[in-house]
């Protein structure tokens, strides 16, 4: 599997039916489509992410009444129901990669207020090891993440995720996949 950019990532997440928050890819001027999204998926907060480049600007906690103002800053963006609506339910967040040869990379945090980007900047656990390393047992809920990755055969792919203590997202599961990467 080759994922070259954020558009590829979103398409592959949809194709593989991975759990994610309701999300829509839009472009500058798509005000009516944005308002329709808010109506269909009512929430207190939305996340707005620049999808025109890697590591683009993102706002994790945009109040419902500020969304239209915020989207004017982007040429290509996604709007989604924000994980900020579930802060108190977040158990683990970050990115992981499980390799077919048994190697593991993980950069994760248990901080409930963290986004993936925050977790990678200030991780509680930042490891490059293998699946047999007992240190992985120290990471809360890591087995749940591994089980999801294995079940969906997401090997040799960097997976940005958050794990919750309740079911959320379009498929009502306790894990959300934000992005998957291979070649960017």
Predicted region positions:
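Nucleotide/phosphate-binding sheet-loop regions of phosphoryl- and nucleotidyl-transfer enzymes
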Residues: 1-184
């Amino acid at each position: 599997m080759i994922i070259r950019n954020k558009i590829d990532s979103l398409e592959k997440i949809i194709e593989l039916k991975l759990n994610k928050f309701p999300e829509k890819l839009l472009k500058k001027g798509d005000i009516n489509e944005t308002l329709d999204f808010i109506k269909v998926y009512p929430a207190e907060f939305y996340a707005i992410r620049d999808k025109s480049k890697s590591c683009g600007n993102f706002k994790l906690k945009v109040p419902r009444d500020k969304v239209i103002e915020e989207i004017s800053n982007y040429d290509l963006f996604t709007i989604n129901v924000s994980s900020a609506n579930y802060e108190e339910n977040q158990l683990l967040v970050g990115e992981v990669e499980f390799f077919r040869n048994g190697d593991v990379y993980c950069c994760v945090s248990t901080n409930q207020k963290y986004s993936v980007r925050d977790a990678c900047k200030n991780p509680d656990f930042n490891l490059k090891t293998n699946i047999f390393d007992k240190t992985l047992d120290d990471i809360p809920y890591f087995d749940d993440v591994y089980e999801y990755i294995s079940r969906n055969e997401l090997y040799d792919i960097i997976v940005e995720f958050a794990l919750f203590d309740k079911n959320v997202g379009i498929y009502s599961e306790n894990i959300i996949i934000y992005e998957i990467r291979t070649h960017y």
